[in-house]
UniProtKB/Swiss-Prot annotation:
Extracellular side: 27-73
Signal peptide limits: 1-26
Cytoplasmic side: 95-99
Gene that this sequence comes from: SMIM9
Membrane topology: Single-pass type I membrane protein
Gene Ontology CC terms: plasma membrane
UniProt xrefs under InterPro entries: Smim9 (IPR038853)
UniProt name for this protein: Small integral membrane protein 9
Compartments in which it is found: Cell membrane
Sorted UniProt keywords: Cell membrane, Membrane, Signal, Transmembrane, Transmembrane helix
Covalent S-S links between cysteines: none
Membrane-spanning ranges: 74-94
Length: 99
């Protein structure tokens, strides 16, 4: 396989791994970080750590996944995904298709 394709695949796998590790390491946030007001009628604080809607959506999805799946299943999925990525890279590196 061409070195350029290997470099692209390696970059994508590295980016995906970093994204997954960041997601796992992120701590759960209170509802005020999502912009949800409490029943007392107070407005959410717009402090210096303003978050984009994409980060809020990511945090919402992470909370949904954490509440629906046990932690062991999440860890097993991440380890399996990393193992499959490594095996895919080894397959690409070792097996060179014959033309």
């Amino acid at each position: 396989m061409e070195p350029q394709k290997l470099l692209i695949i390696g970059f994508l796998l590295c980016s995906l791994t970093c994204l997954l590790l960041e997601t796992v390491a992120s701590s759960p946030l209170p509802l005020s970080a999502l912009g949800i007001q409490e029943k007392t009628g107070s407005k959410p604080r717009s402090g210096g750590n303003h978050r984009s809607w994409l980060n809020n959506f990511r945090d919402y999805l992470w909370q949904l996944i954490k509440s629906a799946l046990p932690p062991a299943a999440i860890v097993a999925f991440l380890l399996t995904s990393a193992l499959m990525g490594i095996l895919c890279c080894f397959t690409i590196l070792v097996v060179d298709p014959v033309h």
